[in-house]
Amino acid sequence: MNKKIDNKRVGFHSIESIIKNSPHKIKKLFIPQSRDDKRINNLIALAEKNGIKYQVSKKLKQEPEAEITNENNLSFQDLKIFLEEKNNKKLNILILDNIIDPRNLGACIRSAAVADVDALIINKHHCAPLNDVAHSVSSGGAEYVRIFFVSNLVNCIKYLKDLNISIFGLSEHSKTDYDQADFTENTAVIMGSEEDGIRKKTQESCDSMIRLS
C-alpha cells in the first residue's frame, strides 16, 4: 500500500520551517485562541511577513496547525535524476527500511537533517507513513532533506551500487564498529527498526554490515 504524505502540520518547529523554506505550501494557518505570548506572536509575524493569512481557532489548545498543499512523493525516477545531477559531488545517503513507528521515522528524518545527508530514501512498503506525527517529531527536518520513496529497495540498492556508492547496513550483531568503516567515498547507510533491524533481503544486498557501538 502506498504511504501518502499527510497534508497537515502540527507544532511550531514544523510550521516555522515550512514558512521559512516553502511558504507557498501553506494553504491555511490556524492559531490557538487560548495563546497570546511571544512565541505565537512571532509565528504570526513570520506568517504575515510571508503573506500567509491565519485564522484563530477555539478548538486548538496550545499548538498551531497548518494545512498544506498536496505533495507528490518523490519517486525512484526522481532519485535517478537527482543523483545524475550530483555526479561530481561526494554523496552521503540514508536509507530507511522497516521503520514502522511514525515517531521513529520523524526522529530519523531529524537526524538526517542535522547530519546534512544528501538524500533520504524510504522503503515505501515497509515504513511508517510520513504523517503529522512524523513531521512533528522531525522538528521541521523534512523541509531540509530530499526524501524519496521507492517500492523496490533491493533494485534501488543495486542501482546505487552501479553508481559506485558503498552500501552499509546497521546491525547490532555486526563485529565491525561504525568508526571502522570507510566513509571517504560515496556511501549509503541503511537503518532499520530498533526491534528487528533491517529486513533479510536488504541485509543480503549490503556491501557490509556495521554497528553503532
Residue ranges and their predicted role:
Residues R39-I40, C127-V133, D196-S205:
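Short, glycine/polar-rich helix-capping loops at beta-to-alpha or helix-loop-helix junctions
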Residues R35, L60, N70-N72, I100, ...:
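Short glycine-rich anion-binding loops that position phosphate/pyrophosphate groups of nucleotides
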Residues K61-E71, S138-A142, T184-G192:
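Short basic, glycine-rich beta-strand/loop surfaces that mediate nucleic-acid
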Residues M1-K86:
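N-terminal positively charged helical leader segments and presequences
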Residues S17, H24, I31, I52, ...:
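RNA substrate-binding interface of SAM-dependent RNA methyltransferases
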Residues S14, R39, N152-C156, D177-D179, ...:
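Short acidic active-site motifs
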Residues F168-S213:
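Active-site/ligand-binding-proximal alpha/beta "capping" segment
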Residues K53-S57, F148, I210:
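General small-molecule cofactor/ligand-binding pocket signal
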